[in-house]
Structure formats: structure tokens, C-alpha cells
Regions:
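Activation of the activation-loop gatekeeper triad in protein kinase-fold domains
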Residues: 40-44
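Active-site activation/catalytic loop segments of kinase-like enzymes and analogous catalytic loops
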Residues: 49-84, 98-115, 127-134
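ATP/Mg2+ or Mg2+-diphosphate-binding catalytic cores
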Residues: 106-160
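Conserved protein kinase catalytic core
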Residues: 29, 46-48
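Histidine/acidic-rich helix-loop-helix segments that form or flank divalent-metal centers
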Residues: 83-91
Length: 160
């Protein structure tokens, strides 16, 4: 799996050249004076512009349907169509979403085992669904999908 993660990272195309919140999801957004504001920015850095988009759209804490996910993605892509190639954006978005959700599964599992914080375990099946959503139609994930299917059968992932 590590080899596949390195392969995916090597296939990111966008430069690390923009502010990235790194924890950009609905719970860290607030309305302030009729504007949208972010909180919890201590982990921000310069990174890939698709990272926060993946964090927001494929947020494990906020279940949304594919139609809404596509609307948000398409809105962002349209706003940035002169700056970013569509194929490049989608590639990086899907890779970062998959890697982020794999990391989330690991963190939530560690919290349960090490710290006895089991409340996050209920979110893991949705993380798997988000991973599945992104890898099912993209050939770049073929080997990773095979490894995940071999090591984490759908029964374990709670996917039906």
C-alpha cells in the first residue's frame, strides 16, 4: 500500500503554491457579518489547491449526495477554469480525497485503540464509501483498489 501511496503522490500535478487550511470542512466554517469565515487554522500551510476542495466535498462528518458534491466541485472548477486545467484538477482532487480518507481511517482507528475514543469509529464506513466513490472509475487507482479489496474486504468496510 505504501508503494501505491507514493505512486499517487508522484502523480499529483498541481504545484504546492496556495494557502491550504488542511482541515477545511463544514464544522470549521462560520458565518460572520454576512461573510464566510474559517476557524481552526493552526495547521495551515502552502500546498495543493485541490486539498481543501477534497476536504470540503468529501468530508466524512457531513454526508452529502453525489449531486451536491458535483455542484460544489463544478462551481470551484468554473471559478478557476483559467488558472487550472480541468483534467489536472480532477486528478489531484481524487488523489487527495482518497489519501485524506485513508489517513482519516487510520487516525480514527488509532484514536479508538490507543485512546479509547470510539465515537469516531462510526464514521469509518463513510470514509470507505468516499474512497470507493473516487477510485471506482479512475484507472490511476487500479492497483490501490486491488490492494484495498484484498486487505480490506467490503464486509470489513461495511460496504454493501
Amino acid at each position: 500500500i505504501n508503494k501505491q501511496i507514493k505512486f499517487l503522490i508522484s502523480n499529483l500535478n498541481l504545484k504546492n503554491d496556495t494557502f491550504v487550511h488542511r482541515d477545511f470542512h463544514v464544522s470549521n466554517l462560520m458565518k460572520y457579518k454576512k461573510k464566510l469565515a474559517t476557524i481552526d487554522t493552526q495547521d495551515a500551510l502552502i500546498g495543493n489547491r485541490a486539498y481543501d476542495l477534497a476536504s470540503l466535498i468529501d468530508d466524512v462528518r457531513f454526508k452529502s449526495n453525489k449531486k451536491l458534491k458535483d455542484r460544489i466541485y463544478n462551481y470551484y472548477a468554473k471559478l478557476n477554469n483559467k488558472k487550472i486545467n480541468k483534467v489536472t484538477l480532477l486528478n489531484d482532487f481524487e488523489i487527495l480525497s482518497v489519501l485524506r480518507n485513508m489517513k482519516i481511517i487510520g487516525i480514527f482507528t488509532r484514536l479508538a485503540i490507543r485512546d479509547n475514543k470510539t465515537k469516531y469509529l462510526k464514521l469509518i464506513p463513510y470514509s470507505w464509501k468516499l474512497i470507493e466513490l473516487r477510485i471506482k472509475n479512475n484507472e490511476i487507482f487500479h492497483n490501490l483498489k486491488s490492494l484495498l479489496d484484498l486487505n480490506f474486504p467490503k464486509k470489513i468496510r461495511n460496504l454493501k
